């Protein structure tokens, strides 16, 4: 007997709660369940374990939860926009733009504060998205996903080349940038930038209310127009959603690959193509993957730590190979 969609949502929610608790408990210092409960409900500022749980571990768990959900939903929206099951937010050049601004800030402007770098990465992601969409629509008023994808690929290669050139000329700063370039949520403090958390949450909620429009848009532009939808405006809203969600994620965690590609495909294999279900389910799966990958990154070479982007890259590559082997794609 197959499970109903609501059951899948419940299971994904339960998994998210479990991995979140594990994230608070696992690391170089193991925290027992009684200690965790004590830290959460009877906090003692003089207790090192309580400070660890509610400080760095809570912060990185929240960052992993938010970035995983944001990247996954941005990937789902990208696949709707392009009607391509292997599309991901990176096609807009978001990663390349954000990383370029981070590298420029550290090496040329000498910016080292986490808050300032997050702002620079976020602005870079948004500006590059605007540039890509502008080039994709150059000399034509109509939004064509194929042209935008080509523009995104070109701009990504251009900014990647700029980034590599700057790094080669400033090798002294390379070590400090490696973790950010590889994708990492260690040494991040969400409490220093609560506004970024608010932005991601607001756009995730707004994405859910876009679901009815996405259901219609997935038929065809002509049918959507015939049903009274303003297709051009919907596509521009989708572009905004992708750029803000993906840009926020890259700003917080660096360049994380594959989450926006594999999670929407997995969600569409499990649930029917109704975006009222797919959007929250995709967000839950993305959060579960990011938190799980972060846990693995902490313990696999303990006491050292791997960038979480390496773990998501390995997992994503394996899942993508499996999907390609099975020929399973559905938009």
Where are these regions (language model features)?
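Alpha-helical transmembrane segments in inner-membrane proteins
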Residues: 1-331
């Amino acid at each position: 007997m197959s499970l109903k969609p609501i059951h899948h949502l419940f299971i994904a929610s339960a998994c998210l709660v479990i991995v979140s608790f594990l994230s608070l408990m696992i690391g170089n210092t193991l925290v027992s369940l009684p200690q965790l409960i004590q830290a959460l409900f009877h906090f003692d500022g003089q207790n090192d374990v309580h400070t660890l749980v509610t400080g760095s571990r809570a912060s990185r768990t929240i960052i992993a939860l938010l970035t995983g959900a944001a990247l996954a939903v941005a990937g789902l929206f990208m696949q709707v926009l392009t009607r391509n099951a292997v599309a991901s937010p990176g096609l807009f050049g978001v990663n390349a733009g954000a990383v370029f601004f981070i590298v420029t800030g550290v090496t040329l402007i000498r910016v080292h504060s986490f808050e300032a770098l997050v702002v620079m990465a976020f602005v870079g992601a948004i500006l590059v998205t605007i540039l890509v969409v502008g080039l994709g629509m150059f000399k034509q008023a109509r939004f064509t996903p194929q042209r935008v994808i080509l523009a995104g690929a070109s701009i990504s290669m251009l900014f990647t080349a700029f980034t590599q050139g700057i790094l080669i000329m400033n090798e002294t700063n390379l070590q400090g940038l490696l973790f950010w370039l590889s994708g990492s949520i260690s040494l991040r403090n969400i409490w220093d930038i609560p506004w970024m958390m608010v932005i991601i949450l607001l756009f995730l909620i707004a994405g859910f209310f876009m679901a009815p429009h996405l259901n219609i848009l997935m038929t065809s532009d002509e049918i959507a127009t015939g049903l009274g939808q303003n297709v051009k405006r919907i596509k521009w809203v989708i572009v905004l959603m992708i750029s803000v969600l993906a840009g926020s994620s890259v700003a917080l965690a660096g360049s994380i690959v594959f989450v926006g590609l594999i999670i929407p495909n997995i969600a569409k294999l499990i649930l029917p193509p109704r975006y009222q279900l797919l959007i929250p389910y995709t967000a839950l799966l993305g959060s579960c993957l990011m938190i799980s990958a972060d846990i693995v990154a902490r313990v696999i070479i303990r006491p050292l730590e791997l960038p979480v982007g390496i773990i998501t890259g390995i997992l994503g590559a394996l899942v993508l190979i499996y999907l390609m082997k099975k020929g399973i794609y559905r938009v």
